[in-house]
Amino acid sequence: MHPAAREAFCSLVPRPILFLAVTSFGISAFMTQLALMRELLAAFSGNELIFGIVLGNWMLLTGIGSALGKTASRLKSPITLFVLLEILIALLPVADVFLLRTLRNVVFIRGSEAGVTETVASCFALMAPYCLATGYLLTLACMAAAEKLPSPDQPTMLRMVPVGARIGARGEGALTLTLSQRERGQKSIGQVYFFDNLGGVLGGILFTFVLIRFFSHFGILYFPAVLNLALAALVAVSARRRLPAIASALLAAGLIAAAAIYNLDDITCNLQYGGQKVVYHGASPYGMLVVTEDAGQYNFIENGLPLFSTHNIEQVEETVHYAMAQRPDAKNVLLISGGASGTAREILKYPQANVDYVELDPLVLDVARRLLPEQLNDHRIHVINADGRQYVKQTGRRYDVVIVDAPDPSTSQINRLYTREFFDQVHRVLAPDGVLSFSLGGYEGYISKELARLIAVAERTLAQVYKNVLILPGTRNFFLASDGRLTPAVADRIEQAGIPTRLVNRSYLNAMLTPDRMADVRRVLSDQAPINEDFNPILYFYHLRYWISQFTLRFGFFEAGLVVILLIYLARLRPVPLAIFSGGFAASALEVVLLLGFQILHGCVYHQVGLIITMFMLGLGIGSLAMNRFLPRCGRNHLAALALAITIYSLCVPYILMFLGKSESPTIAWISWPAIPVMTLLLAVLVGMEFPLAGKVGFQDVAATAARLYTADYIGAALGALLVSTLLIPILGVTAVCLLAAGLNLLSAAVMIVSGK
């Protein structure tokens, strides 16, 4: 850092204010990431590929920003840039959400889905300013913290460990460091890492457990915006920068006034769904729910994906009668999802039927009761707010018919309703000869190669549990499974039972269930098709390919450029950054594995999922704090030992998850609740310990070292986020992903040991 600039930071900005500013970065980054993630998923009809693209772009861009931060050592006025960047990261999230909602239907055709290439480019462009600024600030903060670490004869309450003697003189243009300067630089990297993660913990707790329940995304983002503007003003005042201080204060006041006067959530939502009347929009813990009304039809949309529409008589009647016609005398019917669309009431046409309707999102139920009271207000409909799979696992009731009216398996969470393990759980709650029904993919007279794979996998997975499987090609492919008899003569059964229908009648069924269409479906079945399992979700991957097949996938200069840059970067990684890269990849990959394991074991319980993410951030903070205290006694071999510890951990994870999943013991089931959060904490502690130690082992100067390590960490995490959930787990399975993480960390440990000899 320029000598005059160093003096300004040392003498003018107190360390508590500097670390408060870094903590505010962490709060802002975590809240912004979660809010933007949900907005982007909604804007681009998010499946897990979109999730991976968004998170991968976020990590990659922040890593690039950190790499650019090494130029901070040449700045003449770093405080001014520090304040300006903090103002920027305060305002950009609100602007990003506004632009995303208003420009989505300007850049792309309204109502159309954006392809993969368009999504990658859009996410990259939208997130680039914020992520680059955040990454740069982290490196700049490391430099500021290094200059402000006290000498032993300058005691302070904030000193974490003793450091060396006073900073020695530096010759003009020289790169020589005294021992004291080196120790200060090494310490600063770990301290900034700790306070950044502390902010992430606070942001995660606030977002997950408080703000999301009471505020829109705009309302949530106002909190970190005002916080960052306040800290920017405080830093500017401390540094006697009057103009930036006044600007920060005025912007904070203006933002508060604008929030009070204008409801940006209402304004942008109406622009986003122009042509339809938005009758409700809001955020629940499970996503963004929008309800529009068009010509008397209500459309429920969650995270950009249509949940259901009212007056869709064809879909409602097919969903109900293909299944119920198999057992017209059914008394107990379980309906998982979709009941508010009219399916629950349609089931009541069968005189003996009583319906248990299970819906995960309480907001969907609340809005449906408000807008569609006639659909659920009946003493024969029992509404249960729970995760469908968890309910099936825990219920002691027996059902004659189980109808899963869920979307296609576009995410690993939804895929849980299409696995062999779930089908086996349903089998246990079915009465003898009971029927399970669900639909998968559309049928318009032609079965594509991608759709054929979906059908074959679903049929073979069902056949592992049920004696009989029947597929009826309606507007969608309806799967029926039972140990009893199944018949395609749906029209005969409906007429014999005297059930009135509006569309699904004999003429309709004769047109749909023709011998040719039935033969087309049978033709794609295969005894060699893979089986969809909890920890090997191949059906989700095939659905992803089915979704991608709807677009013209172009691998253009943008994607090629990213790949080339990444390959060059990986080829040039030295041992210490390689350890951080491997740890970042393992952290991202194994966190996805643990979240998947928790959802499989205990269902999608939002607060618990939020707890796991918060525990991960907490573990990073604990690990970095612990290593900062023992840093003087640790060296290169300890970094290799941490990489080996992550290797061993990675090898243990799949076997622990499978043991917890297969055990029928109530004690093991009880232990599994805290087990996964504790496993997450342990993983994060190991990864968090690596970063400060790498800052010491690979130290050159503060800017270069911080930039290099943050870049390696974020790029490793970006690859883990992008590849693991979208490709590696669906194709290879959980065990292979854990082996890959173990192998990468074993390689980094070996390189570290060999290079140190």
State what each model feature region is:
Residues M1-K757:
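Alpha-helical transmembrane segments of multi-pass membrane proteins
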